[in-house]
A protein has these predicted regions:
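Membrane-embedded alpha-helical bundles of multi-pass transporters/translocases
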Residues: 2-467
Length: 467
């Protein structure tokens, strides 16, 4: 990159692809737990479903605070070496993340309390290593580019990478696991393959992405976990985005956790999950590709809200008419196409709130903003893991037998009605309370640049007087 106006400077395609590879890697490791770990607990380890829900709640709540710890570490960095401010965390945390992602799917013959303890500890350790790796990855966008359109494109590439990782996991994990006559061995081997793949993609991201604008933390600014919370509540656009994301991520993860049960017990075809994943994730990829163009034409907020409408419509159609394989896949494609815009813009909007925070406080703290934001995401993920486990117990789910009509109806409500309701809440929150539009953002960036130019001129004048 040459030294031009950072607001108009464009990134090369290679760097955008490399950044997207980071979320391919992250999601290859994360999605195996999001999609299949609860089922592994209930069907292979013999845990009651509510045990699995409690494990998700405890571990995800713990990792919400490890996200804060990551922000503290990022914002505390003073002596930044040639690897950059964020990239070293990607490099060094990817190894334990991949290792623990595999260990979570190792079946043991211990008693139920011991199994539960081990599962909880492993999930918490995975969350810690994943926080160090993924929060740093997400917080890196403002250091890569200051161009708002390029940020939207990076977010689209990130969401595209996440979708590819999720697609591979949805389509390939169960077929790989089914290759082994012993299902417990199948889970372990499939998890190992996905973890190795995830690690490789994280290394490709590390090698291909550069931090072009590294802002060191001011000397008088001391990072703290408390400041991560303050970064949220003193930044209204960030707070609104956090609340909306709390709803959207919970809705999305509930759908992912329940779809394996829905295809097996409601539609009586667990292999349909691979086909559904192929088509619906394909629709997400199409949506992701359309994000930069639609944002340029209509603006981020309008595209976000349109995605929420599509999501809700798809779920409503599926609840009433998705009783066979064809209509289930078709209406799921509509819903997932809508999520492409929502999930992409969840990340594209965060860098804008970083700049808003700098404009308002004079302190640029990407780590605090991003980890405050991911704190809400982890709370959302905790609820998304906890609620299915509890609700599976409430609706009378028993593994590996034909389910009652009441249980089947409960599964339909879990996968369609709950996510739809959360999507509507998120849409109302963003529609009425998010006020950081493109025009206002441009004025904020202009004022920040004027401040910095004034500070530089003052420093140069002081230096010349001293000499």
């Amino acid at each position: 990159m040459s030294d031009h106006n950072p607001l108009t400077l464009k990134l090369n395609l290679r760097e955008k692809i490399a950044y997207g590879m980071g979320d391919v890697g992250s999601n290859l490791m994360l999605s195996i737990s999001t999609l299949y770990l609860l089922k592994f607990y209930t069907d292979e380890l013999g845990m009651p479903a509510y045990y699995g829900g409690i494990i998700f709640l405890v571990a995800k709540f713990f990792t919400a605070f490890t996200d804060m710890l990551t922000g503290f570490l990022l914002d505390s960095r003073k002596n930044i070496g040639p690897k950059g401010k964020f990239r070293p965390f990607i490099l060094y945390a990817a190894v334990p993340a991949a290792l623990i992602a595999t260990l979570q799917f190792i079946a043991t013959t211990f008693s139920l309390p011991v199994k539960t303890t081990i599962a909880t500890a492993l999930f918490m350790m995975f969350g810690l290593s994943y926080s160090l790796m993924n929060c740093s990855y997400g917080a890196m966008i403002p250091a890569i580019t200051k161009n708002p359109n390029e940020r939207a494109q990076l977010a689209a590439y990130r969401q595209g990478g996440a979708t590819i990782g999720l697609l591979i996991c949805t389509v390939a994990f169960i077929p790989l696991q089914s290759l082994f006559s012993d299902s417990t061995v199948g889970y372990a081997c499939a998890a190992l393959m996905f973890s190795i793949g995830g690690f490789i993609f994280m290394m490709l991201c590390y090698r291909g992405v550069k931090e072009h604008y590294v802002d060191t933390t001011p000397t008088g600014h001391k990072a703290s976990i408390l400041k991560s919370f303050c970064a949220i509540f003193r930044n209204p656009p960030l707070l609104v985005l956090c609340i909306a994301n709390l709803c959207t991520l919970a809705a999305f993860n509930i759908k992912l956790a329940i779809q394996v049960y829905y295809t097996q017990y409601v539609l009586n075809d667990i292999n349909l999950l691979s086909w559904m994943g192929f088509f619906s994730m394909g629709c997400i990829l199409v949506g992701v590709l359309l994000v930069p163009l639609t944002v340029k034409c209509f603006g981020k907020k309008q595209v976000y809200l349109a995605g929420m409408v599509l999501w809700a419509v798809g779920d409503i159609l599926n609840y009433f008419w998705g009783s066979n394989s064809f209509t289930f896949v078709m209406f799921s494609c509509v819903a997932f196409f809508g999520t492409a815009f929502v999930n992409s813009l969840n990340w594209a909007l965060v860098p804008d709130t970083v700049d808003y925070g700098e404009w308002k406080t004079g302190i640029r703290a990407e780590g605090s903003v991003y980890t405050g934001y991911t704190f809400f995401r982890k709370i959302s993920a905790a609820l998304a893991g906890f609620l299915p486990g509890i609700m599976l117990t409430q609706i009378g789910y028993v593994p590996n037998i034909a389910q009652s009509d009441a249980t089947l109806q409960g599964l339909r409500q879990l996968i369609f009605i709950w996510p739809c309701a959360l999507a509507i809440i998120a849409a109302l929150t963003m529609g009425f309370f998010y006020t950081l539009n493109e025009k206002r953002f441009a004025l904020i960036i202009e004022e920040i640049n004027q401040r910095k130019n004034k500070e530089m001129a003052t420093e140069e004048k002081t230096a010349s007087v001293t000499l």
